[in-house]
Swiss-Prot record:
This is Large ribosomal subunit protein bL12. NCBIfam families: L12. One of its GO terms (cellular component) is cytosolic large ribosomal subunit. One of its GO terms (molecular function) is mRNA binding. InterPro entries: Ribosomal_bL12, Ribosomal_bL12_C, Ribosomal_bL12_C/ClpS-like, Ribosomal_bL12_oligo, Ribosomal_bL12_oligo_N_sf. Gene3D superfamilies: 3.30.1390.10, Single helix bin. The lineage of its organism: Bacteria, Pseudomonadati, Pseudomonadota, Alphaproteobacteria, Hyphomicrobiales. GO terms for biological process: translation. The keyword GTP-binding does not apply. Signal peptide: none annotated. It comes from Rhizobium etli (strain CIAT 652). PANTHER family: 39S RIBOSOMAL PROTEIN L12, LARGE RIBOSOMAL SUBUNIT PROTEIN BL12M. Keywords: Ribonucleoprotein, Ribosomal protein. Forms part of the ribosomal stalk which helps the ribosome interact with GTP-bound translation factors. Is thus essential for accurate translation. The keyword Ribonucleoprotein applies. The gene is rplL.
Amino acid sequence: MADLAKIVEDLSSLTVLEAAELSKLLEEKWGVSAAAPVAVAAVAGGAGGAAAPAEEEKTEFDVILTDAGANKINVIKEVRAITGLGLKEAKDLVEGAPKAVKEGVSKAEAADIKKKLEDAGAKADVK
């Protein structure tokens, strides 16, 4: 166990360049590639044609404002709070619906943003 602890300590002290070189050396010595499993998994998922598992693995979502509704002022205020945009930018986004309000967020955050927009009187979708 003491040897393993020393190995962990040595690996922790490596710079990024040293770690990359170590990775290359180990790939050559063991005859493996760190990128191969990722490529194989992507090809296998695409070849199977199963759309449902691909959706289950989705981790980033976009919140789309589909309609501002009758109460645009509240929606603009909410868009400003969510995005940090200025008044003019938020107004342009709301009036230009359908537009993405927030992109690449977690499922929970997307649901929260959608609820806030709907509470303000807008219609929104999570994609």
